[in-house]
């Protein structure tokens, strides 16, 4: 009987004995590894000496002669890698799937910033340079190796915008801060008589009502009465009002009734003082708690008129005015405008002095009471040399600008300058008293003279 070694020697040998032996060893090793629990598959060798001469033809790997093993994925990758290295060494580039070449990006045009924008452009360029590494990294990490394209467009100020900004700056057309208007009623919140909740509505109504039933230019319709006679009557009314110690509202309403009646009815010269006395009686009954007696009015007229004359003229005036004597006078606006000016007692006395001087001026009889009151405040500001002369608060509450008041205020300042030499100086002597601060003795405003 032949032994095991003799049978092995007598068996026919394969053509490639080395390959068969190697295959048997690999199979035995794989079987042994599969039999061991927890065993891992052996990694492919990094270098296989017997495939150094592998070739790639039409994207397929051609094994050397004598190698018949199946080509796995990892084994094929190793063969391809080795073949590419050999081809590169021989200056022959082997590419498995040649990709489509993309045209190289054109270099970006260089933008030269203007001198005034050099700092901004340099700052923006520095920011873009800092962003370049991150953008290249993002392109490298994209799937498929495709580079991401970022469109970076620099913001450059156009020539038109630059010229427009320069023109506005040269012409002074810039955004000016809003004018600050002071809340003049903030201290009267707890005063119910101040009616802070609807004080603005009240004065808006006054501004509308002052345009109704205004005296007109009546001197052309008067035959025996002229502006000088009216000024004499107004000066006498101021004197009587001061001696009777009546309310200020009574004085301004008296002059309104006189002017309104003269606008509607021609009056004889001898009856002009009678009209003034009857108008004061009407205003006193409307404004005062205790109106003067008719006998007292007869006395101040030096008994020129009887009781029947005064009462008859009173009735005639009321009928001619249709009993409409509820009108805004300059006094109601003076109170509001003095408060807006934030004036002290000296400014208040000076304003009332100019307003009483305005009562003697016939040219101001037909003007709006708000305009006369605002002009008196402006003239007082100029006389006392207050700064600023006209604030945004005064402009808001009066509704007039400084230029709108200048002409009317100039008339008042001229009357103040002529008062010491005038025969009609009742208001001048009244406000020269120590009780009223002697404001009439102040020198007239030079800026309006």
Swiss-Prot record:
Pfam families registered for this protein in UniProt: Cyclin_C, Cyclin_N
Disordered: region residues: 1-37, 98-147
A cellular component annotation (GO) from this entry: cyclin-dependent protein kinase holoenzyme complex
SUPFAM superfamilies according to UniProt: Cyclin-like
Highest taxon in the source lineage: Eukaryota
InterPro entries: Cyclin (IPR039361), Cyclin-like_dom (IPR013763), Cyclin-like_sf (IPR036915), Cyclin_A/B-like (IPR046965), Cyclin_C-dom (IPR004367), Cyclin_N (IPR006671), Cyclins_cyclin-box (IPR048258)
Xref: SMART domains: CYCLIN, Cyclin_C
GO molecular function terms attached to this record: cyclin-dependent protein serine/threonine kinase regulator activity
Disulfide bonds, paired cysteine numbers: none
Annotated GO biological process: cell division; G1/S transition of mitotic cell cycle
Cited PROSITE patterns: CYCLINS
Gene3D superfamilies: Cyclin-like
Biased composition (Low complexity): 8-37, 136-147
Keyword annotations of the record: Cell cycle, Cell division, Cyclin
Family label: Belongs to the cyclin family. Cyclin AB subfamily.
Identification of the protein by name: Cyclin-B1-5
Highest classification ranks of the organism: Eukaryota, Viridiplantae, Streptophyta, Embryophyta, Tracheophyta
Chain's gene name: CYCB1-5
